[in-house]
Design a protein with these regions (language model features):
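Local sequence-structure signature of Cys/Sec-based thiol-disulfide redox active-site neighborhoods
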Residues: 119-130
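Bacterial N-terminal signal peptides that target proteins for export
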Residues: 2-14
């Protein structure tokens, strides 16, 4: 039988490495789990090669990723979840000019785009957020994922308030502040999206004129 070790990379992706032994999460002891994780990490680092903008530092984990990898496939203890959320909440930064809402039409384009950070992508061009891969947003788009909750009528359901706009900004900037070990990328914290792009995605969610709220 093979043992599967799950490692969350710096880019937020989950990598699964197979090693000899049983199932990682289950009856295995904590020291054995750590040893397997260390072997898997070493194997990943030795097998990956830098290619363009996809450099090896993407395999380096921060504290949040390390903890999420450690508890992958197991219930996350409440104290650990609170520790992760508190640490990530502290990373959130609001724009200096205080403007949180941009252009929802640009936000729709960003939500549709999955480009960015792959070795074959042009690093000089802005990345997309690929929101539709996990969420329903505009009803006009029939192809969407269901890993995340539906965001259709996000603003209408929550209210077109400053509180809703601030929450949307924070959630996009760093989702781990609200849901420890979320699969959602930390778009602001990891510099995937610019402040201007985050404004536009916020607008897609909270602008009454956006198709999301029609």
């Amino acid at each position: 039988m093979q043992r599967r070790t799950i490692v969350r990379t710096a880019s937020g992706a989950l990598l699964i490495a197979a090693t000899a032994g049983g199932v990682l999460y289950g009856c295995a002891s904590a020291p054995a789990d750590r040893a397997d994780g260390q072997r898997a990490e070493a194997m990943l680092k030795s097998s990956f090669k830098a290619h363009g903008q996809a450099t090896l530092d993407r395999l380096d984990q921060d504290e949040t990723q390390r903890l999420c990898s450690e508890y992958a496939g197991r219930a996350l203890p409440q104290p650990v979840a609170e520790r992760i959320e508190k640490a990530n909440l502290a990373t959130i930064r609001f724009p200096a000019d205080g403007k949180l809402v941009g252009d929802w039409k640009s936000g729709e384009k960003i939500a549709q785009s999955g480009r960015g950070f792959q070795y074959s992508d042009d690093p000089t061009k802005p990345a997309g957020a690929n929101c539709y891969a996990c969420h329903q947003l505009s009803p006009q788009e029939l192809s969407y994922g269901t890993i995340g909750p539906s965001l259709y009528q996000f603003g209408k359901r929550r209210g077109f308030t400053d509180e809703t706009r601030r929450y949307a900004w924070q959630k996009i900037y760093n989702a781990q502040a609200f849901n420890a070990c979320s699969n959602m990328p930390r778009f602001g914290h990891r510099h995937i999206l610019t402040d201007a792009q985050i404004r536009d995605v916020v607008a897609l969610l909270v602008d009454p004129a956006s198709p999301v709220n029609r």
